[in-house]
Amino acid sequence: MKKVLFALSFLFTTSLLFAQPREDMDTSWKNEYRETATKINNLIHTKLEVKPDFSKSYLYGKAWLTLKPHFYPTDSLNLDAKGMEIKKVALVKGTKQIPLTFDYDEWNLRIKLDKTYKSNESYTIYIDYTAKPDEFEEKYGGGAMLGIKGMYFINPKGEEKDKPSQIWTQGETESSSAWFPTIDKTNQRCTQELTVTVDNKYVTLSNGKLASQKKNADGTRSDYWKMDLPHAPYLFFLGVGDYAVVKDTWRGKEVNYYVEPEYKSVAKKIFGNTPEMMTFFSKITGVDFPWIKYSQITGRDYVAGAMENTTATIHQESAQQDARELVDGNIWEGTIAHELFHQWFGDYVTTESWSNLTLNESFANYSETLWNEYKYGKDASDEHNYQDMQGYLMSGSDKKDLVRFHYKDKEDMFDAVSYNKGGRILHMLRNHIGDSAFFKSINNYLTTNKFKSAEAHQLRLAFEEITGRDLNWYFNQWYFGSGNPTVDIDYVYDDAAGKATVIVKQTQKTDKIFKLPLAIDVYNGTEKVRYNVWANNAVDSFSINYTKRPDLINVDGDKIMLWTKCKDCTNKCRS
């Protein structure tokens, strides 16, 4: 997901949106370990038949969920089902439906199964329900960052003449269960069928392929969407509205852009780099775009910047720019790259818990740097990466681990640490081990964990397998630790001895000392000599011999380190 604050310019990012966080008086959450959700039952397949009611902002639904016990036998099923009216729960046996007893409290649907099932036995549950997302949000929404209602009816009665009537969904973090019953956890995944019945004037979009459409006698149409590859419930998507669909293609796969009709003529100017991005990302990951199609849709009043629903990304309306605005460049290009890369990192391989969110977001964040490097050159890439780093450094988040198991709310994980810092850490790792090893390692991570959930240790193991190096030090320092070094760099020249000494002092206000692989470049005229060194101590000194005093000594020659430098450094010379 691309949060609004990460889509804005560097100016606004640093001066407005990353203000110092307020001190939280409630600290009880610091003692609560956020463990990965226990798997009791595993989703296998979800089949939905839904019909939205614009007049009430309701969704009438029927769900068939196929599951099986993960390992231990069980005689019960606990589903997330938020703010619904549950009309019927039954076990499907051939053509028969056997009613089951259940308990429901507006959040969880607890079902007593007909028997104890073993891990090699699957079963299918039928649920007839009505989702009432607006009523649920009004009752329980509170101050949730993205809301909790999962499904958004935009101008449902057409009372706002300058706004289209739309429906779109937002599942992340755990709000898909506000429009269909499921096990709403990141470590679940299943295949999917969805049939949605809407007025014939509307266009629909969901995950997978539009397999069929049927016009009904009452002026409605039923669209049948089919997703044959498994993905997480929070990535399920449904969009409905009056859209122009602009068609593109990539290697025979559909690539479509859903925009409001007045933007039809410029849709390819906004989204048209998508096929080239798909080629580029397929090449660098070594994994061809894994899904059957890729569509992008805009949503009025969308609650974030964009969201990487599998095969069906949604963007906020700001993505829609007219021809005059596009003359100055496409402000949404980075977000388009970000969400597309999520189709690999987030959808193909999914974080197993919100604690490990950076496995999704750091790669999506770094994809913007990679795309800039490929498309516009190293200077553009370095500028983007530097701005991202500054966004983290100015966010006041230096006490947060990248992977953290203690947080007040899972929404708190969507911050400059998971995104910006995580992206910079990948950039440093790439520079440390080299391009070939880096991209082979991410290919190893993707292929080893495809259609599964993963945690940071699996990323480490993927890198270790390729490089042959123990990288625990790197992951312990950057993934499971907080902060960043602050350094004071000093230079002492002794012309008589023909020696320069570079002194690197770590001055961060913690006891933690960082292990830093550094490149020191020494310039004389057009000649550059690079020295690769390690700074492992509070103070490290590095001696460089010379016959002629260097014109420049440049520590961190490629400017890839995640650190801050003291402003009062002085150059000391003695002859």
Residue locations for each model-derived region?
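Hydrophobic loop/turn residues within beta-sheet-rich immunoglobulin-like superfamily modules
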Residues: D114-T116, H338, N545-T547
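Small side chains
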Residues: A7-S9, G61, A500
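Acidic/His-enriched low-complexity segments
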Residues: Q20-F289, A416, N431-I433, N449, ...
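Bacterial Sec-dependent N-terminal signal peptides
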Residues: M1-E23
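Non-catalytic accessory/interaction domains
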Residues: Q170, V198, V203, R221, ...
